């Protein structure tokens, strides 16, 4: 390219309030990745690495023609967490059949949807339901309530760091459900 400034002036006319283009600025690209169910269930690892690099054209006047270049590889490490939940009475007797839903807000309006898997319950990514993270969107068809097993236990996989509210929706026969949600804080600690 003989004159990059001429191309920028042509493509981005009057870029700022002074009708000038600013050269030499950094271009920042952001990407997002989603963990699948296998990754969500594989907690305890030192994190999941996502590698990315960008291929770009060296000739801005032509689409998909000519030589290309690459940015250096960039790596982002993400983490996921699991939670073991035990439902017992005040004498530590294990209670089967207690039903729960989890929320990301204290008023218990933004549900953290989960689906049943062989080993427990996996968090469903809200991006797939029309929301972002743990807010908004519609309930996916596979979303279920969490139910304690014969040992009073269930496991939630794929949690992000943050505060959650576990609300009992139905108590086992002969018991009353909890009056208030249980506040759960997932606070990651990283070592370097």
Say what each PLM segment does.
Residues 1-192:
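Solvent-exposed loop/turn and edge beta-strand elements of beta-rich ligand-binding domains
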């Amino acid at each position: 390219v003989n004159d990059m400034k001429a191309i920028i002036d042509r493509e981005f006319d009057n870029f700022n309030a002074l009708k000038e283009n600013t050269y030499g600025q950094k271009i920042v690209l952001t990407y997002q990745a989603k963990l699948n169910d296998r990754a969500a269930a594989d907690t305890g690892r030192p994190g999941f690495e996502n590698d990315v690099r960008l291929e770009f054209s060296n000739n801005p006047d032509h689409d998909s023609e000519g030589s290309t270049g690459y940015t250096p590889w960039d790596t982002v490490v993400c983490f996921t967490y699991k939670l073991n939940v035990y439902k017992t009475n005040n004498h530590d007797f294990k209670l089967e059949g207690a039903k729960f839903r989890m929320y990301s807000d204290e008023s218990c309006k933004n549900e953290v949807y989960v689906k049943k898997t062989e080993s427990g319950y996996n968090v469903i990514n809200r991006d797939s339901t029309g929301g972002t993270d743990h807010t908004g969107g519609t309930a996916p068809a596979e979303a279920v309530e969490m139910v304690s097993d014969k040992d009073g236990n269930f496991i939630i996989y794929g949690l992000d760091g943050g505060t959650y509210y576990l609300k009992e929706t139905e108590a086992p026969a002969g018991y009353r459900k909890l009056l208030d949600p249980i506040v759960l804080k997932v606070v990651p600690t990283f070592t370097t």
